[in-house]
Amino acid sequence: QWRRVQYFRAGSIDALLTAQKKVGDQADAKNRKLATEFGRICNSHDDYIWRAVAGKGNERARGGASFSVYYVCDQAREGEADALVKSAFAPMYDQMVADGALKSWGWNEHVVGAQYRRLATITATDVASLMKARSAIVAAMEKNPLARTLDTICDSHADYIWEIRSEVP
């Protein structure tokens, strides 16, 4: 469904919206024709605002590749999903960041957007390292009964691998 992602990070929703407007205003002032051409080429989009619930390593450079899992969840049980990630999965992800297998990981909650209610991300140096780490995560999850509980709360998802082409802290 998606082929490109553009995102902004900030310490609050107000700061996020201010940063997004500033970037948009600068792009329009610099080259309206180029912005129009970009809009013609990438002529549809979905807007989401996410809030970080848990994660590690997101305050520094994330590496060259990201694996994102966009979850459709039972809204009444989202808090339970958050608690599971923090208690059952965060220690594994944190260790993978400490060991260098991952550059970062994150678990985010939906603030604004469409059907996806939670977003899990992992990043690594490159796609090969990312997929190796992802395989280790899947193997660990298959042995963890709490992973099946998470699957009952968030029973549908879409997976994307992103090559990070440009990132400014």
Predicted feature locations:
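Glycine-rich beta-strand-turn "strand-cap" elements at beta-sheet edges
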Residues: 1-4, 28-65, 102-119, 142-169
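Short amphipathic alpha-helical segments
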Residues: 77-103
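Charged, low-complexity, helix/coiled-coil-prone segments
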Residues: 22-37, 73-83
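Short, well-ordered beta-strand segments in beta-rich or mixed alpha/beta enzyme
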Residues: 1-25, 63-73, 106-141
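Well-ordered, non-membrane alpha-helical segments in soluble/globular domains
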Residues: 26-30, 84-91, 139-140
